[in-house]
């Protein structure tokens, strides 16, 4: 399971011209689910995302996590994170989880994060337009 996390001052996701999820300060989480992923991996990744210290303290040192800053999450499914880009000029998605498993684990991840912070989401398997203001920019790729 892969999360591309971006520290944002604001982010939103639109589907068919309608905003379906929007946050102020916090993290935009692009979530990719792979074939071998499980609820245990989702638990580990949720814990890591929620506790990853990428927000500035009073000395502007990355020492605080999203919970400590009263931040929010915008979680957006992104199967392309599971792409194999090692060969050729076209990505292979053979490592990606089947849609039913991917949706189940995506929803589970959202639920786990929602136990600790406010979470907004995109729409699974939809064409989405994501806009954000990356604060920093600060972006990390997390994999469990």
Swiss-Prot record:
GO cellular component assignments: cytoplasm
Main location: cytoplasm
Catalyzed reactions: glycyl-tRNA(Ala) + H2O = tRNA(Ala) + glycine + H(+); a D-aminoacyl-tRNA + H2O = a tRNA + a D-alpha-amino acid + H(+)
EC nos: 3.1.1.96
Superkingdom per UniProt: Bacteria
Record Pfam families: Tyr_Deacylase
Keywords: Cytoplasm, Hydrolase, RNA-binding, tRNA-binding
Record's subcellular location: Cytoplasm
One GO MF term: Ser(Gly)-tRNA(Ala) hydrolase activity
Motif (Gly-cisPro motif, important for rejection of L-amino acids): 136-137
One GO term (biological process): D-amino acid catabolic process
Protein purpose: An aminoacyl-tRNA editing enzyme that deacylates mischarged D-aminoacyl-tRNAs. Also deacylates mischarged glycyl-tRNA(Ala), protecting cells against glycine mischarging by AlaRS. Acts via tRNA-based rather than protein-based catalysis; rejects L-amino acids rather than detecting D-amino acids in the active site. By recycling D-aminoacyl-tRNA to D-amino acids and free tRNA molecules, this enzyme counteracts the toxicity associated with the formation of D-aminoacyl-tRNA entities in vivo and helps enforce protein L-homochirality.
Subunit structure: Homodimer.
Protein's recorded name: D-aminoacyl-tRNA deacylase
Taxonomic source organism: Mannheimia succiniciproducens (strain KCTC 0769BP / MBEL55E)
Native organism taxonomy: Bacteria, Pseudomonadati, Pseudomonadota, Gammaproteobacteria, Pasteurellales
């Amino acid at each position: 399971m892969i999360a591309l996390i971006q520290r944002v001052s604001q982010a939103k996701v639109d589907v068919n011209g309608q905003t379906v999820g929007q946050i102020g300060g916090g993290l935009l989480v692009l979530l990719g689910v792979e074939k071998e992923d499980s609820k245990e991996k989702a638990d580990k990744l949720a814990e890591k995302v929620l506790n990853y210290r990428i927000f500035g303290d009073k000395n502007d040192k990355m020492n605080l996590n999203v919970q400590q800053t009263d931040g929010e999450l915008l979680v957006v499914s992104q199967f392309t994170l599971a792409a194999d880009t090692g060969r050729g000029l076209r990505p292979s998605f053979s490592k990606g989880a089947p849609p039913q498993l991917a949706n189940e684990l995506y929803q589970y991840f959202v639920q786990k994060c929602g136990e600790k912070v406010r979470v907004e989401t995109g729409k699974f398997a939809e064409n989405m337009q994501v806009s954000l203001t990356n604060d920093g920019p600060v972006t990390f790729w997390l994999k469990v």
